[in-house]
């Protein structure tokens, strides 16, 4: 059973598999190689991917996207407050965690970001299963290199809820470097800078690639909250202001108008990557008012100027951390859809004194490509190209504990290789102190109050002794997923305590994960029931229209009038029933089909036999077969719905 690689993106996701010595990026049921990270809830069903994004203007409040901007964060995170201004769906606090509120089948529901992401992951899993023709459980999932511990852990939980065994969480730029290194058959030692600007996150990583098989990450930097959506937001604000100026109407109060404007803005942004001007035309945008305008590339660049410039700071930081200067970088590789923006490219090129940028890998698919390779390696694939690949990644943030006076004492420095393990000895702060509280933080600031708290645990039962005498050994063990285990041991008694940092405030408990796994299965069952219902409805519709058409077109004398009227009456009754019972259950559709078949089949058979008698294989023969298949319907069960 193959393992798959999934690029779980803010706006789009992508899945790949390594087989027969190469990576296949797998297209979804719509034929697209990337799938929107959207989930929609309606009165009757749940939609994921393209169908969800396609109906967003009709159902903005119940269509959820950007779960990656919520995952592993706390509700009071200022970034979330900023995003909520742009989201049509509701985000509420549930014990300090953000939850998304929607209406589904007439009921109010609340979902954790992990659940929404798990639904997207389930869609990617099903896409791969349909292509490979077998069930899949093992996967590698990618995250931005700058994701912190809680964001990584939450992504792993999302995989678990989707029924996946997550072999490894790997960093997106590292996966892209893997794709680049294997695709280009690099020779010798090369320093490669991966510039990854996607829909919602931004990463820069510098790697040394040796003979195209040893991939060593030297440094990483980034912003987990900068990407194409932020550029869209600037353009939407500009267009909404223009609409208000021209027509004295503020469309911001209307989620549907705002959504249609956002879709047009996103399209215009894409156009501006290849043209210097984009036209926006939206009929009846708000209160019946049409909106026609033009946006020039120069205006778009001015609107996003500070955001574009901000992409260079992490580049500088990554170079400093890797102790390299600009001239030592051999290749600059662009990844992520937003790197198609000409201004982003020109700023980066100027920063590197006119050096050519490498545009040779597909920016939308490179990360999934690398993840698929890593999945094959971890599941023991020994084929030619990948058997020698060794990937050495680094920790994006420093990790440490709080010591007297609120000082951050680091045990693991940022950009140290992972997996890694560090031990330091600490002591008590007061005489006869019976226990110590180990508070774990991540971040680069000197004081813990400015860093991100990951978790706390207490080590008690320390024998009475003067301050500074007891020896407490604290060990940090950072695994290959970038997830931390911390243990503390009092040396004289041998008492020990350890935790996997599960970010008590932000993480899901095991019970919550189990509940979500069960709910995910329940939703999958509901989706399956809905699919079967639609299949039964389509079978009935198809049969009734085929029979009706065959009878209406039957040549004169082939069918007596009474039979013809009897069939037509029955068909018209069924069509009327269909029109007034659109939400009937599968069993009702099946029952109607059976009833209709019982009534029409003998007449159709008679008509068919007469036709065959009149002239074997005459036109009637085909009509009969088309219309009935004599009882059981075996015609097409798919109907195009416009």
Curated annotation (Swiss-Prot):
Reported effect, residue 189 to G: In strain: B28
GO biological process, one term: response to heat
GO cellular component, one term: plasma membrane
Region named Disordered: 609-642
Gly residues bias locations: 612-634
Induction: Heat shock induces the synthesis of seven proteins at five otherwise inactive sites in the polytene chromosomes of fruit fly larvae. Two separate sites, producing two and three copies, respectively, code for the 70 kDa protein. Expression is induced by proteotoxic stress caused by toxic protein aggregation, for example by overexpressed Atx-1/ataxin-1.
Any one GO molecular function term: heat shock protein binding
CDD domains: ASKHA_NBD_HSP70_HSPA1 (cd10233)
InterPro entries associated with the record: ATPase_NBD, Heat_shock_70_CS, HSP70_C_sf, HSP70_peptide-bd_sf, Hsp_70_fam
Membrane-spanning parts: none
UniProtKB keywords: ATP-binding, Nucleotide-binding, Stress response
PANTHER family in alphabetical order: HEAT SHOCK PROTEIN 70KDA
Functional note: Stress-response chaperone protein that prevents toxic aggregation of proteins.
Subunit structure as annotated in this protein's UniProt entry: Forms a complex with Hsp83/Hsp90 and Dpit47.
Family statement: Belongs to the heat shock protein 70 family.
Something else known: There are 5 or 6 copies of the gene encoding this protein at two separate loci, 2 copies at chromosome locus 87A7 in reverse orientation (Hsp70Aa and Hsp70Ab) at locus 87A7, and 3 or 4 copies (depending on strain) at locus 87C1. Most strains have three copies at chromosome locus 87C1; two tandemly repeated Hsp70 genes (Hsp70Bb and Hsp70Bc) and one in reverse orientation (Hsp70Ba). Some strains, including that sequenced in the Drosophila genome project have an additional copy making three tandemly repeated Hsp70 genes (Hsp70Bb, Hsp70Bbb and Hsp70Bc).
Record protein name field: Major heat shock 70 kDa protein Ab
Organism: Drosophila melanogaster (Fruit fly)
